[in-house]
Design a protein with these regions (language model features):
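Hydrophobic ligand-binding cavity/cleft-lining segments
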Residues: 1-43
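Hydrophobic/aromatic beta-strand elements that line small-molecule binding cavities or substrate pockets
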Residues: 12-14, 46-49, 71-77, 100-108
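Intrinsic-disorder/low-complexity, polar/charged segments enriched in Ser/Thr/Lys/Arg/Asp/Glu/Gln
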Residues: 7-13, 20, 44, 56, ...
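Short beta-edge strand/loop motif at the mouth of beta-sheet-based domains
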Residues: 11-12, 31-68
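A short, structured loop/turn motif at beta-sheet edges
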Residues: 20-21, 50-52, 76-83, 105-114
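Hydrophobic pocket/interface hotspot
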Residues: 23, 33, 57, 75, ...
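Helix-adjacent hinge/juxtasegments
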Residues: 58-80, 84-86
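Beta-strand/loop substructures that line and gate deep hydrophobic ligand-binding cavities in soluble
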Residues: 85-87, 91-138
Length: 152
């Protein structure tokens, strides 16, 4: 390991003009998730998708012609329309880049849904990975707003 471990917590929130059931379904459906979850200049492809407690997703992401990053997601807790807790390991070839504990909290509001995303991350390649996770998640949430038809 060349870099020191770098720990961070990233918290992002969005209010969507859609009920929790609709927002949750966008996470539960891997085909839908693939359409909005990659940042605008990147692509994402699922090789495996098993959205259930104990289930795993295996995905590749990166520039559209170079999906060099590999992610493995393990779902630990899924409370429909309310909460998802999962871990994610991201690697580049044989090198592990980061491990993250992710919590998605779907809170009903008068306007629709307040989605709070908390990512507790350890980067094995320095603080740039934290910046990448934050900008990637921010881009995904913005894309989800466009996909759902708006956010507040």
């Amino acid at each position: 390991m060349k870099e020191k471990l770098h720990h961070a917590t990233v918290i992002l929130e969005r209010v969507y003009e859609a009920p929790p059931e609709r927002v949750f379904s966008e996470f539960a459906n891997p085909q839908a998730r693939a359409r909005w979850s990659a940042p605008s200049n990147d692509a994402l492809a699922y090789d495996e998708a098993d959205f259930r407690e104990g289930g795993h997703d295996v995905f590749r992401c990166g520039p559209p012609n170079d999906l060099r990053f590999r992610g493995v997601t393990t779902y630990h807790t899924i409370t429909p329309n309310r909460c998802v807790v999962f871990t994610e390991t991201l690697s580049d070839g044989s090198a592990r880049l980061a491990i993250a504990l992710n919590t998605l909290d779907f809170e009903p509001t008068a306007q629709g849904t307040n989605l709070k995303v908390t990512v507790q991350l350890v980067s094995f390649v320095g603080p740039g990975m934290v910046e990448g996770y934050e900008s990637g998640n921010r881009g995904a949430l913005d894309s989800l707003a466009r996909h759902l038809g708006g956010s507040i």
